[in-house]
Amino acid sequence: MMHIPRLMCTQHPDTTVKITTAEEVDEAIVAYTAYGCDEVMVDYEGKMTPYGQPKEIVMKAIRGDVPLGDEFYITVRLPNPKLEEFDRAMLSLEAALVANYFSRRYADAQAVRWVVLPMVEDFDTVILVRRMLRRKAEIYKSETGVDVGEVEVIPLIEDAFVQVKAKVIVGEVFKSEEAREVRVFLGKSDSAVRHGHLASALAIIYAMSKLKEFEAESGIRVRPILGMGSPPFRGALNNPRLAHLEVVQYAGYYTATIQSAVRYDTSLDEYVKVRESILNACCGTRGLVGEEVLPLIQEASAKYRSQAMKHVDKIAEVARLVPSTRDRVSWKEYGRSLLDGDRVVHMPRAIVYTSAWYAMGFPPTLIDAPLLLELAKSDKLDAVFKLLPTYKMELEYDYEFFDPQTARNYLSEELVYAAVELADYLGVEARPTPTYTALLKMPRSEPNIIALSKYRKFLG
């Protein structure tokens, strides 16, 4: 049986350390040799990664005796051709197959077995990419005599309203395939930007439950990948203080992303704790999550979007100061859309968005505070904490970075007051340390945001 990776090293710009594309080749090898990651994701989604990078990683791995295609894989994330230029998607596929051409020629191994297709909302695009891969592979074999192997498409579903349909989408994507084992990627971050922390967290546990159902009904083994970062808003699976709890809350995953912040902004001991928590809890099970959560996901999303829409100008103002620590396309060119009725607003991508909220003294998990107070008053909050057993600890963690005085300079009194009232209800003391408070009192600038981020151990 083919080895399925457990730890996926990514190129997310969530660290305070600037990493250039030139450094990413060495970074990929270090991910295996120092951090124990058995997969590295070369990212082309909204990112100016050289198309020769997968091949360069292949050649470096061969020279370093890294067990390519056995214990170490390169996985390419291409742009979704519906959202970015079609040529960029095709060039990314070419980069993956060129890497396999060289790994097959020089190491008789297949370095790239999977490509990730982001922002999947239907199965047509997945099938298009799969068809293009197979046709390109046939041409390589017929024209060069080199079998670059079969490359599978991993659908990355990263919108709460689409994740709740994961069972249907996966069923359509793999219904005509002979595979007995498939990988499905669930992303927390972009879903949180669009729908808020509560809705996106509930959508993921519901999707995991439905994928388990699909597995039982189809006989196809599903290997879920969880895409999560360090802050609670982005899943906290990489957070040294929360990872051991999050692995229980999101039980059922097989692979987890190891993003940049946990590798560069924490100590090696802290990283090892995160890694061991993820590995030890892999493949655990949790009770089935029923359809009763769907109305709550809808309500939480609507309430969150209503609050976020009121503050779009301030978010954009602060987001412009958040530094880019990878060679990504600016969020102004490739951001995220937030829908509220007929209104569409252009938002930063998840890491910049999250960082901006922290810089305003208001962690983005607290945007749900008005709804949580409503749930508390109607005796429904305990049911939420039962579904998400780590949720209260996430809120307690984020209240360490909440400063009402700073937040009032940017946000409505209504939202800030709701966060204060929620802290009182939960019995949580909302008090940042004197050092963090002093940083919040300073004028916002790029160095100031970096300093705040270094204290938290993540940019966003």
Swiss-Prot record:
One record GO biological process: carbon fixation
Official protein name in the record: Phosphoenolpyruvate carboxylase
Function: Catalyzes the irreversible beta-carboxylation of phosphoenolpyruvate (PEP) to form oxaloacetate (OAA), a four-carbon dicarboxylic acid source for the tricarboxylic acid cycle.
Keywords, sorted A to Z: Carbon dioxide fixation, Lyase, Magnesium
Subunit structure comment from the entry: Homotetramer.
NCBIfam families referenced in this protein's UniProt entry, alphabetically: PEPCase_arch (TIGR02751)
Cofactor: Mg(2+)
Chain segments annotated as transmembrane: none
Catalysed reaction equations from the record: oxaloacetate + phosphate = phosphoenolpyruvate + hydrogencarbonate
Disulfide bond annotation, renumbered to this chain: none
Similarity section: Belongs to the PEPCase type 2 family.
Stored InterPro entries: PEP_COase_arc-type, Pyrv/PenolPyrv_kinase-like_dom
EC number(s) per entry: 4.1.1.31
